[in-house]
Design a protein with these regions (language model features):
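Extracellular beta-sheet/turn segments enriched in Thr/Pro/Gly and aliphatic residues
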Residues: 16-41
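Solvent-exposed serine/threonine-rich low-complexity stretches and specific carbohydrate-binding patches
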Residues: 14, 115-127
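Short structured motifs
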Residues: 9-10, 56-58, 69-73, 87, ...
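A short, solvent-exposed loop/turn motif at the edges and junctions
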Residues: 1-14
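Exposed aromatic-hydrophobic patches
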Residues: 23-26, 129-141
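Beta-sheet-rich sandwich/jelly-roll-like modules and their strand-loop junctions
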Residues: 33-108, 148, 154-203
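Surface-exposed coil/turn segments at beta-strand junctions on protein surfaces, enriched
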Residues: 18, 76-79, 95, 126-130, ...
């Protein structure tokens, strides 16, 4: 199975590639309807999603170069928001280098549909004590009232052996297998916060 945020998922039977040393693939671009044009009020950023209440233990990725799992919170917003900043706390990181990916999805039934054109990437080096990461979101990113969303956090690259730990929080979360799309809901997850400003449709 081949998957990328910008293209439709493609499944290739084993007998097509099992006897070949190389395989040329052509992926079909994924097209999505964009949100309506929005006018953003000139207000100070407010909290859209909080981390939750601290839980015992951590959420951790061990000895991964490119994990097949992502995890993060599920949430519903109470009004239309224009997201500007995502924040994430790392408890510790023993990788010499590590790249974390964040994607915000809209949840429609059992389907997770990205609402971003480009994922957010954060590059880290070794961290011995907790550190708060703040990511500025440049593209227009609108969350709609009463819609359900999911923030998937995954380790996409690392220097090899090591681990990265995120503090655990009591908040409804989900672990998703990126290869099979299987999902498991959990009562705790890592702490991601979103900040932005309320938006209204252009009349």
């Amino acid at each position: 199975m081949i998957s990328h945020i910008s293209y439709q998922t493609s499944k290739i039977p084993c007998d097509v590639y099992s006897k070949k040393t190389s395989l040329q693939l052509t992926l079909k671009e994924k097209t999505c309807d964009l949100s309506d044009i929005t006018v953003v009020s000139g207000k100070k950023q407010e909290s859209i999603l909080g981390k939750g209440v601290r839980a015992p233990g951590d959420v951790a990725f061990h000895n991964v170069r490119n994990t097949k799992y992502e995890t993060g919170p599920l949430f519903v917003v109470n009004k239309d928001y224009y997201v500007k900043t995502a924040k994430l706390r790392v408890q510790k990181c023993t990788f010499a280098s590590c790249t974390i990916r964040l994607i915000i999805y809209e949840v429609k039934g059992t389907n997770f549909m990205p609402v971003q054109h480009r994922p957010l990437y954060v590059r880290l080096s070794e961290i011995s004590d907790k550190k708060d990461l703040s990511v500025w979101i440049e593209e227009p990113l609108k969350l709609e009232r009463n819609h359900k969303y999911y923030i998937g956090v995954a380790v996409m690259a690392s220097s090899g052996n090591g681990e990265i730990h995120f503090p655990a929080y009591f908040k409804k979360g989900c672990v998703r297998n990126l290869c099979t799309d299987r999902k498991k809901n959990l009562p705790v997850t890592l702490g991601v916060s979103l900040y932005g400003i309320s938006a209204k449709h252009l009349q």
